UniProtKB/Swiss-Prot annotation:
It comes from Homo sapiens. Residues 131-163, 205-377, 431-535, 562-679, 716-745 form a coiled coil. InterPro entries: CCDC175 (IPR038834). This is Coiled-coil domain-containing protein 175. The lineage of its organism: Eukaryota, Metazoa, Chordata, Craniata, Vertebrata. Keywords: Coiled coil. The keyword Coiled coil applies. It comes from the Eukaryota.
Length: 793
């Protein structure tokens, strides 16, 4: 009776077993979920990202490093999402297997159901909580990464715009700098042409000066030769004049003695005439005395003729000396005129040289101004270079910051690699592929890091070279400025000296002109004096000629009267009457003799005056000669001083020319440096143009990749939203599953309590028998598989 109510329970148990067998279907259907879990778009995005990664790994593709890193980060994030998706699928499969195990245990092991169900429920709850927490953490991480990516995108857009503006500014500055350089080079070319022209002109002027110096030297040599000849002639003429003066003095002494003798004879003649008058009686003696007197008269007539001849010779010599003196004066005047003409020519050449020197000085001033302008332009270019260098340093600091950011990203990548290693332990099938990809990426990163290190080393070397070059250029510019200042000081000193010398030369020229005027006046006075003396000499010569003619007439008369005297002597006795006539004649002759004596006295007095005048003229001539010699010496001293001044000026001109040569050599050195700088600038221009072209190409590629990236990001955002919806659905289903598990646990607890009651009611032997004959079947509530539908949406 007690067992009767249990029979329907057995039937109910069979029904429950059948229901339980039917309920195993949904749990098995969980294992047949699709591999994509409803994210086909993510697979397409992964394929596109793999293509992008391959293109990034290729050496042909060139893009900004930040864009590369950004794309790599996106690829890694998408890979992580795909791995998370696969991990969730694996976990769901594991949970389905565990549920199948639980169903199997519930079916096969009714005795140990409590422990296993409790452990299963605990494990399931723990796993569910852990999975929920991990999913939440991953969702927050993905959201944070998405926000970071958006911030990076905005920063990159801003940085790209700033770089575009900077590039435009740099292009404008570069164009301005190129224009300024072209202008400076044109100015330098014009200055070099002008310098070459001035150098050629200076060389021509130098050659002209050398020719003039040669002409001056030749003229000086001729002057010295003519001076020597003039001195020799002068010495010869002075010797001849001294000889003639000596002979003249000897003859003068002889004439003076003869005059004395004539006076004595005249006294004797007077005495004889007195004796003749007194001793008229003694005719024989008188005749003898008359004969003696005639002989003495003849003797004295011969001496007088000789004296006349000597006087004629002396007059001829005086004429010769006067002619030679006039010739010598003419020659000296011609030589003086030649020297004056040469001095005038030299003064004209000096004036022309001064004018040329002034022109050259003005040209030097213009060149100095142009040089200062070029220096100011070079300073401006140097300041522009410094600005460009500062901008480069700013860019380098920005690059260093980016490198630091890259190092941080590398650390993040290493952490991600560690996470990948942990994931590779779970997925052994994809381990080799990901390791190869990671090796390739690490190799590329090492290459890029090595390239970055090499480029940094090159940049440091170039900076050092640039710093050394700038230091050298500054030192050279300072040395040049010091040299230019010294040259300007020296030039100012030379200009002062030249002005002082010019003043001295002008003073010397004025003195020379004064001396020339004085010499001309003295020469005119001397010529006038000579003319007056010549006139006086001509007058005295005419008087002397008249007196000689009178003496000749008287001698002829005496010759005529001699035969008459002989006749008178012969007829003295016969013609005594004629004595009175003769006495009258003698008295007349006495008167004539007195007149002759008076004339002789006057002649002697005039001759003495003439001699005194000649001595005065000689003294004046000596004084004039001394004055001329002094003046010539002064002229020679002035000429020597002028020659010394010319020599000093020539030396100064040579020094200036040497300084000009040095300046030209330094200008050539500067030109070479400028050409080197220009070549370096052209190389920089080419490199900058190449870099600008590369930047333009990279910008185009970057824009294309950026558009693709934006499309992919949009797709990924859409896919992420879908995945989030899927994850939310999964969490809802997991919650429903937990609730169902709780219901199952409550039902199991109720069944366990029922079993306990049954155990308490029945004996253990009955239970063993029942266990042998009866297999209990548990009926679980049928749960429809809605997860498949929700997951496959």
């Amino acid at each position: 009776m007690a067992l009767s109510p249990w029979t329907p329970g057995l039937g109910a148990g069979e029904k429950l077993v059948q229901a339980a067998a039917v309920s195993t279907g949904p749990s098995l259907e969980l294992c047949t979920l699709p591999s994509t879990l409803g994210s086909s778009v993510a697979v397409e995005a992964l394929e596109q990202l793999f293509v992008v990664e391959q293109s990034l790994q290729s050496d042909y593709f060139k893009c900004n490093e930040e864009a590369k890193i950004f794309l790599k980060d996106i690829a890694v994030a998408v890979k992580k999402l795909e791995e998370m998706r696969k991990a969730t699928i694996d976990l769901l499969e594991i949970e389905s297997m565990e549920l199948n195990k639980l169903y199997y245990l519930l079916e096969t092991l009714p005795n140990s159901i409590k422990r296993e169900l409790e452990e299963c429920v605990r494990d399931a709850r723990r796993l569910n909580l852990f999975e929920i927490n991990t999913i939440k953490m991953r969702i927050t991480r993905t959201e944070n990464e998405i926000e970071l990516l958006k911030k990076k995108i905005t920063d990159l857009t801003k940085y790209n715009e700033a770089l575009g503006e900077k590039q435009e500014e740099l292009a404008r500055k570069h164009a301005r700098f190129v224009l300024s350089l072209n202008q400076t080079m044109e100015k330098k070319a014009t200055t070099t042409v002008y310098i070459n022209e001035t150098y050629t002109k200076i060389n021509l002027k130098r050659e002209d000066i050398a020719l003039q110096k040669k002409c001056i030297q030749e003229a000086e040599e001729l002057m010295e030769k003519e001076r020597a000849e003039y001195l020799i002639r002068k010495q010869e003429l002075t010797a001849q004049i001294n000889e003639f003066e000596n002979t003249r003095e000897v003859k003068r002494m002889e004439t003076y003695q003869k005059k004395k003798e004539l006076d004595k004879l005249q006294t004797k003649m007077s005495k004889i005439k007195e004796t003749v008058t007194v001793s008229a009686a003694v005719l024989s003696d008188h005749n003898l005395e008359i004969a003696r007197l005639h002989e003495s008269i003849r003797y004295w007539e011969q001496e007088v003729s000789e004296l006349k001849k000597d006087l004629a010779i002396l007059e001829a010599k005086l004429c010769f000396f006067t002619d030679n003196k006039e010739k010598l004066d003419d020659i000296s005047n011609d030589e003086k005129n030649e020297f004056l003409n040469k001095i005038k020519q030299l003064v004209e050449t000096l004036h022309a040289a001064r004018m040329e020197y002034k022109d050259l000085r003005e040209k030097m001033k213009t060149l100095a101004r142009q040089y200062k302008i070029v220096l100011s332009e070079e300073e401006k270019a140097f300041l522009q270079k410094q600005k460009i260098h500062d901008e480069n340093q700013k860019q380098l600091t920005f690059i260093s910051q980016k490198e630091y950011f890259l190092s941080q990203k590398r650390v993040d990548i290493k952490n991600m690699e560690e996470g990948l290693i942990t994931l590779q332990e779970l997925q052994q099938a994809t381990k080799t592929v990901y390791q190869q990809q990671i090796k390739i990426l690490s190799a590329n990163l090492e290459r890029e890091s090595q390239r970055c290190v090499i480029t940094q080393w090159k940049m440091a070397c170039l900076r050092k070279k640039h710093a050394r070059w700038t230091a050298k250029i500054k030192a050279e510019i300072q040395a040049i400025t010091e040299k230019i200042q010294n040259a300007e000081v020296r030039r100012i000193e030379l200009l002062n000296e030249t002005s002082f010398r010019q003043q001295e030369i002008s003073g010397f020229v004025a003195q020379i002109e004064k001396l020339t005027t004085e010499l001309k006046e003295e020469e005119k006075a001397f010529v006038n004096k000579e003319k007056m003396l010549m006139k006086e000499l001509s007058k005295y010569e005419e008087i002397f000629v008249k007196e000689t003619q009178i003496n000749k007439e008287k001698e002829e008369e005496l010759v005529e009267y001699l035969p008459q005297l002989q006749v008178a002597e012969q007829e003295y006795k016969e013609k005594r009457r004629k004595l009175e006539e003769l006495s009258n004649i003698i008295t007349a002759q006495r008167q004539e003799e007195d007149l002759l004596n008076n004339h002789i006295f006057l002649f002697t007095r005039d001759f003495s005056r003439y001699i005194s005048n000649m001595e005065d003229v000689k003294q004046e001539l000596q004084q004039l000669r001394d004055q001329e010699s002094k003046k010539n010496k002064d002229h020679f001293e002035t000429l020597k001083n002028l020659e010394n001044g010319f020599y000093i000026n020539d030396q100064k001109a040579d020094l200036l020319l040497l300084e000009n040569k040095k300046l030209k050599e330094y200008i050539l050195y500067l030109k070479n440096n400028i050409e080197k700088y220009r070549e370096g600038q052209e190389a920089l221009m080419h490199t900058s143009s190449d870099l600008s072209r590369q930047l333009i190409a990279q910008e185009a590629q970057y824009k294309d990749l950026w558009a693709e990236f934006q499309t992919t990001v949009k797709i990924l955002v859409d896919n992420g939203e879908e995945t989030l919806q899927d994850i939310n659905n999964l969490t809802d289903k997991l919650r429903e599953r937990d609730e169902k598990m709780q219901h199952v646990s409550t039902w199991l607890r109720g069944s366990l309590e029922g079993l306990r009651l049954l155990v308490e009611q029945e004996s253990p032997m009955d239970l063993l028998k029942k266990k042998k004959h009866i297999r209990t079947r548990v009926h679980f509530p049928v749960v429809k598989c809605t997860e498949k539908n929700t997951l496959t949406k």
